[in-house]
Amino acid sequence: MKLYVIAAYSHAPQVRAIHERLRALGIEPTSSWAEEANGPEALDGLSDDECYRIWDRNRRDLDSASVALVLADTQMREGYSEAAHAMRTGCRVVWVGRPTLGARADSVFGSNGPWFVATVDDALAGLGGMGRG
């Protein structure tokens, strides 16, 4: 199984630690943005082409995953559109933290709504058996 972690850029160290835990469970992380993140996100200094390349790489990483793990309480911005994209395209979404109104509505009324959990530990416990299959 492949999994993409959605979180605020500033939480890249936490995401890298989650990547290690995923690998130990036999789950391949695809969120390469976190492996490369260093310091604060500085989009203002990027050209339009650079922004597009980053966005395109992240989208391809997300599209290659069968599960997206959303760290909703990390004050992310782009992550909400990534989560919506995952739900639209049939990627299973595991939502850690407080859900948004839209995520809750998708969970109740949508065919591919997120699975809500309180902590990363809860998410990994639920996903653990799936990685070895």
Which residues does each predicted region cover?
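Conserved catalytic or regulatory cores that recognize and/or transform ribose-phosphate-containing ligands
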Residues: 1-133
